[in-house]
Each structure stands twice: as C-alpha cells, then as structure tokens.
Regions:
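Extracytosolic ligand-binding ectodomains
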Residues: 1-126
Length: 126
C-alpha cells in the first residue's frame, strides 16, 4: 500500500483474511507458512486453498469414495455435492457452511489504509 502514498489514506478495502484472528490451528499454520516463506504471512487466499483441499479430503472420507476408476463419474459427483452443501466444516480460521456452493456464514473483513498500513475496521458476515 506504499505505492499510492498519502493518496490512499482513508481508502477502505475488503479481504477474506484478517491476520489478527487467532486460534490454535490458524496460529500454527501462520507460523509454518512464515517459516516456509521467508517470514511472510499467508496471502489472502491461502486459507481458502487450504480449506478447499481439506473439504475435498473430508468429502472423500465421509461419502465412501473408493477411487475405483469404474465409479469415477459417480464419485466425483459425490464429492462435488458434499462440498456444495457442507455444514459445520471446520476450516482453518473458523467453522462454516455452504449452500449450493456459496458460503453462508463465512466472514469478509473491511480495512482502511492509513500511512501505508491496513487497519482493521469491521468483520462482515452474510
């Protein structure tokens, strides 16, 4: 946010990620990410990618997917249907639900830029 200098002061932006959220699982992930990425904190979509992979893993485990090539189309549908309407998914940051492929209670965050720094303003939940 330094490129715009003082012209960015007061500009509000949204993000899927608030690095200040704290829970044991997220804190452990942040530390491991920083270690693997030269001290950088996770990027805004990092938790989304992480959750997507673990949601697919959970779908495979809970729907009886076998990996049988003869059932490929059927089993892919099981995974997709599970993920599209999962309830109580324990994600990296919080527990959340999906309805028809859309998160129903997953927050976004509003930040305001001041002197090149993003400052938290508000958590917004659908």
């Amino acid at each position: 946010y330094s490129t715009g200098g003082a012209d960015l002061n007061g500009v509000q932006v949204y993000n899927y990620l608030n690095l200040e959220v704290s829970n044991p699982r997220w804190d452990k992930f942040k530390a491991a990410f920083a270690k693997d990425h030269n001290g950088q904190m996770p990027f805004s979509l990092s938790p989304n990618y992480y959750d997507a992979l673990y949601m697919i893993k959970e779908a495979i485990e809970k729907t009886g997917v076998t990996g049988d090539p003869k059932k490929l189309k059927e089993e892919r549908k099981k995974i997709a249907d599970y993920c599209a309407n999962v309830k109580g998914f324990k994600g990296l940051l919080y527990e959340w639900d999906m309805k028809d492929g859309v998160p129903t209670n997953k927050p976004s965050y509003i930040f305001e830029i001041q002197n090149g720094v993003k400052q938290f303003v508000l958590e917004v939940r659908p």
